[in-house]
UniProtKB/Swiss-Prot annotation:
Annotated compartments: Cytoplasm
A Pfam family that the UniProt record links to this protein: Ribosomal_S3Ae
Name of this chain's protein: Small ribosomal subunit protein eS1
Subunit structure: Component of the small ribosomal subunit. Mature ribosomes consist of a small (40S) and a large (60S) subunit. The 40S subunit contains about 33 different proteins and 1 molecule of RNA (18S). The 60S subunit contains about 49 different proteins and 3 molecules of RNA (25S, 5.8S and 5S).
Modified residues (N-acetylalanine): A2
Gene Ontology terms: biological process: translation
Statement: the UniProt record of this protein carries the keyword Ribosomal protein: yes
HAMAP family: Ribosomal_eS1_euk
MF (Gene Ontology): structural constituent of ribosome
Family classification: Belongs to the eukaryotic ribosomal protein eS1 family.
UniProt source species: Sclerotinia sclerotiorum (strain ATCC 18683 / 1980 / Ss-1) (White mold)
Keyword field: Acetylation, Cytoplasm, Ribonucleoprotein, Ribosomal protein
Entry's Gene Ontology cellular component terms: cytosol; cytosolic small ribosomal subunit
Length: 256
């Protein structure tokens, strides 16, 4: 009888004893902090793999874009149709410090604004803030009926549309180029620019639903940690100790 392996015997399957590790055991939660220009600072949490070897967790977090509803940031449901983009610029401990990265409208809100018998006027302009942020702002407006108007339609003439668009770009340029990004964000939340456009164009054609529908960040200046910490209401300078005044006593040697 030949001595050898019996192929008929069932072999044990490989990999049965291998334990499956939960991928979440290698990850950590980090808190996302919104700038102090918003009412609610705690946006949420994000996951990232722990620092292992040359892979640093902070490097994986920096540059992440978070999209949040403005209603959640301001505790006001009237802002539910606007979405704010925040970019992680710095990680301190378990906190991700973010900066404003853009603004947009929800698609359902934009579709609800477009109606029959009225003219839609759009304008966009590229502006530079005083702290060297290059932004492109998109504005939208709709014509409305004049007082005591009998006519069903409210279509504006081409010359009126051009005049309104010129007025829109002038106001956006004036309001955005004379302030910092933080000050511009403070103007965008209560829609100050939209109301300014509505008032300025009353003589050309009455408008309604005037909004800055989108803000796109094209270029940001060189990263400044001090400016970011000030934006979050923190300081990068260490607390200095109090000076203690003591009476000076000269030591007298007893033996020479």
């Amino acid at each position: 009888m030949a001595v050898g392996k019996n192929k008929r015997l069932s072999k044990g399957k490989k990999g049965l004893k291998k334990k499956t590790l939960d991928p979440f055991t290698r990850k950590d939660w980090y808190q996302i902090k919104a700038p102090s220009s918003f009412q609610i600072r705690d946006v949420g949490k994000t996951l990232v793999n722990r620092t292992t070897g040359l892979k640093n967790a902070n490097d994986s977090l920096k540059g992440r874009i978070i999209e949040v509803s403005l209603a959640d940031l301001q505790k006001d449901e009237d802002h539910a149709f606007r979405k704010v983009k925040l970019r992680v610029d710095e990680v301190q401990g378990k906190n991700c410090l973010t900066n404003f990265h853009g603004l947009d409208f929800t698609s359902d809100k934009l579709r609800s604004l477009v109606r029959k018998w009225q003219s839609l006027i759009e304008a966009n302009i590229t502006v530079k803030t005083t702290d060297d942020y290059l932004l492109r702002l998109f504005a939208i407006a709709f014509t409305k009926r004049r007082p005591n108007q009998i006519k069903k339609t409210t279509y504006a003439a081409s010359s009126q549309i051009r005049a309104i668009r010129k007025k829109m770009t002038e106001i956006i340029q004036r309001e955005a180029s004379t302030c910092t990004l933080t000050q511009l964000t403070a103007k965008l939340i209560p829609e100050v620019i939209g109301r300014e456009i509505e008032k300025a164009t009353q003589g050309i054609y009455p408008l309604q639903n005037v909004h800055i529908r989108k803000v796109k960040l094209l270029k940001a200046p060189k990263f400044d940690l001090g400016a970011l910490l000030n934006l979050h209401g923190e300081s990068n300078t260490d607390e200095q100790g109090q000076k203690v005044e003591r009476e000076f006593k000269e030591k007298v040697l007893e033996q020479v």
